[in-house]
Structure formats: structure tokens, C-alpha cells
Amino acid sequence: MRKIDPLSLKPHWGKSILKLTSSITVILFSLISSLTAQELPTPDSLYVSTQCFIREGNSFQDVVEEGREADVSGPNVVFFRQPIAGSDAAENQFIRIVVWDNMEHWASNVVVTPSDTYDCDNNNRRFWTNRNLGSNRNAYNGTDVSLVTTRRCSVQRGYNISDVYRSLNDTQLAREANGHTSVMHVSHLLLGPSSDTEMRTSIIIRTIGESEVGLARDLDSSFQTDLGIGTPANAPAEFCNDPSLSRSYMVYS
């Protein structure tokens, strides 16, 4: 019987091991990618935000009353948000938020309702995917008016919206464990004007009170802690500004 030199098998072993290692690497990478994708839920809604301006001779209350009397069908909810601590907002300026399921829902039903009391910059609307954070879902609890804070940030280079979601979700769960009742969202800009930022890096962190008093109480609780200065070094977001405060009116639901 012919003897086989063990040394002649080594190259074949090396090739087999290399193939096995490559296969394992591909499988592990696929599993990690799959797990990461599963951690980011699909958007809960689509927010379409538009800057609007009250016409001379009208008040914001006139705008709200007209909005509530309008014959609207299609969107899930419409909010009018009046700046209280805004970002250089004009005296007659407010934001209209129209909530849809997704882009298809918007495209199937979108109608610009004419108004006698205000005008909107409809050519520069912004489209945001919106995800709920934590477990609180009690915004506007028994009321159609509440307070809302919004903080604009950019996704830090090297991170993605999944990283932002996980970080903010952990933050919100910790707040809820400490008794906070407000709802938190993260919105991700996909369409519309975005000044001085790279594409798809603009986000808004939004907190909505179960009522005006509810959000004020949660803010008081936050203000009593040792507030950090600037965006945390380990956060997946950067260039976060100080939050704005608005009074939000639900005009259609």
C-alpha cells in the first residue's frame, strides 16, 4: 500500500480552514446585521411639518378655531404649534404638523386646505419619519392642548439612526422609571430643506406632555439634576441645540 506523506495534506488543510473561516465570518456578519436591523422598529408615523404665518388682523385663536372647523379628511392628526421659547420665530409664526401613516398614505390623500386666517410655506415642507421611544403613550391625555419641547441634533459621523434610537430609548426608559409621564419621539428628516447638514443626518428629539402641567413637572424634575454641558461625548448625535418650547393644539384627529 502506498504511503501518504502527511506534509502533502497541509496545503489542503490550510485551504479548508481558510474557506471555513470565511464562511463563519460571513454568517456572523449576517447575524449581526440582522440583529441590528431588528432593533430598529419601523417608523410609527410620518410627520409633515410646515412653517405657517398668521394673516394680519387675525389671532392664533382664530387660526385654531378655523382649523378645527375645517372639512379635513385623510391625515391621522393635525397639530398647530405656537412657539413659546422658539428659535427666532416671528410673532405671527407657527408650525403645522400633519401626521400620516407613511408616504403612500400622504400621496393618496394629500389636499392643501385653503385658509382665511393664515398662509403656509407649502413649497418647503419637511418630511420626517417618526418613532416612539420608551413605553409612555399618553400624550394629550384627556385634553387637546399640551406643551412640546423639540431639540435639533445631527447624527454623528460613524453612527446611524439605529444607534440614535437605541440610545434615546434607553434614556426615555430611565426617565419613565423615575416617574416621568411625558412621551418622547425621535424624528428623522428624509425630505425637505436642511441647512448646513449632510443628507439624512438631521433629527429632532421631541417630548410631549400628557398635559401642559405634566410636561412642566417633568422639566422641573430634569432641571433639578446636574445637567450636563454640551452633547455627551459618547452620544451617537452631535451639535444638539437647546430645546424649543411650543404650545401644541390638536385641531383634527
Protein language model regions, located:
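N-terminal secretory signal peptides that target proteins for export/translocation
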Residues: 1-18
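Short non-domain terminal segments
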Residues: 2, 27, 35, 77-78
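Bacterial N-terminal signal peptides
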Residues: 19-32
